[in-house]
Structures are given as C-alpha cells and as structure tokens.
Amino acid sequence: MKKLITIVGPTAVGKTDLTLALAKGYNGEVISGDAYQVYKQLNIGTAKPTTDELAAVPHHLINILEPDDDYSVSIFQQQAKSLINQLNDNHVVPILSGGTGLYVQSLLENYNFNDIKPNTKLRIELDELYTEYGVDGLREYAQNLAEKGGIEIKYTDKHRLYRAIELMTAGDYKSLIKQTKEGLSYKGPVIGLQRERSDLYDRINRRVEIMFEKGLVDEVKQLLKSGVNPNCQAFKGIGYKEVVQYLEGLISYDACVDLIQKNTRHFAKRQITWYKRMPYIEWITIDSQTTEAEIYGMVCNIIDSSF
C-alpha cells in the first residue's frame, strides 16, 4: 500500500506552514488538493503558497492550468494518484494538503468515475430543483431513481447527488454500487486542524484584508485585461467573482471586502461540515497561543505511530 500523509482543515486554519515543515522533516513533497490553486495567475485570491514557499519544497497541482481551462474532481483524482505512485516509487513521501473536500475524499476513498459526461440539460433542471427545494428535493429525486435500480442512495452533498442522478438517468447503477468503500486507498494518517470558530473567523477576516493589501483588485484587473472571461470556472472562486462585481460598479469597495469575508467564512463552515462526515480524520485543536513547533510535534506523533 502506498504511503500518503494527508492534512485537511478549513481555509486559513494554518495548513500551509505545517505542510511545508512536514515536507522538510519527512523528505516529502506537497500535493495541493485545492480546486483553484491549479490556475496560473490566480495567486492572491487563492491564497497560493508564495514564490519562496514553492521554491523551498516541491509542490504539485499548482499553476498547471490557464485561467480559462476547465478542471474537475475526476481529473484531480487521476493526476493525484499518478503523483502519489511516482513519489512513493522514488522514496519520497507525498503530503496531500486540502482544501476542497470532494477532491480529498474522492482520492482517499477511491471514488469510481466513469466515462459518462455531465448532462448539461439535466444539470440546468437540477439547478432549478435545488433552488426551489434544496438538498431535500435532490435527495427525493435521487431516491426515486435509486428505487427503480434497486440500490440505496445516502448522499447529502449537492454535487454528489447531481452526479448520482446523472449516472442513474443514464442507466449506470453499477458505478454507484462500486462506490461503497471498505477502508482507505493509502497507508498513512489523515490529520485535521481545527480552531475555535471565533479564532478561525478572525484569521479569515484578516487574511482577506491582507489579500487586498497585496493587490487582489489589480490581480483581477490584469486577468480581465489579458482576456480571461469573467464567467470562466476559475473566476467562480471566492475573491474573484466579488472583485468583478466591484469593478463593474455593482458594489462598493468596502462592500466587496465584507462580501469576500462573509463568503469565505461560509465556505469554511461548509468545509468543516464536510470533513466532520469523514470519520477517519484525526483532529488536532489549535488556537492563537499554539506555536508552530507545538503543532508540528503533535502531528509528528500521529504520523510516526502510523508508519
């Protein structure tokens, strides 16, 4: 079984500094599990590691796509699997840093993705269903299809329900049955960092302020000037869509800052909810008084007892 150290947690919790230290301490390289750090030129708004940090330790799945390119969980899973195999073969420890909950879970639990492409027409209909009835409406729709195929659907996440409905509509019940997972795909701990909500939210608010100080507005201006479509997938990330609204005169500067802070806090809350559904995560609680050395020591104790 291939080795993998996984570090998860909500945005701004402190994963970057930890993964850098672990990579140096364990002869490791970092694999990003973030859906937006894959894009070139999207640096400030994605909280991408700095140039110095990227130079200090090899990083993967960062700066690999142009802003107008599409990316998906299945592509991530395929690329991450290949990297983990290569690094293990070279006696290097891969360290997954996440990030995007679906991406991380799909890799660890080896979700089965087949060749059935997303159904645009169906997704528009599902968007309308979701807008009117929420996740409960999607679950009822999915369960009705599942009963016809003699299977059971327990998903509560919007995106997984969308995909399950697509597969069942196409008659592919077999793939969903295969997604029942026994154990994880890799040897190694899955460690989660968590903070008190007030502490995390303070860090998020300050991080957003720093993004503006570093030039987030200019970054978005330059991307638009270079011809990037404001409706592209990359601009769906928090920080970019709001600045576009500001540049279009739809909201004020202060409202833009407030909106990004609010949306990031909501995103962090969703991340926490997602990860709490993954029972194999070993959680470490930290606060503003916990030093980086203390965090590193606690994590190393878990890692050393896992290998």
Enumerate the predicted regions with their spans.
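Phosphate/pyrophosphate-binding catalytic cores of soluble transferases and nucleic-acid-acting enzymes
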Residues: M1-F307
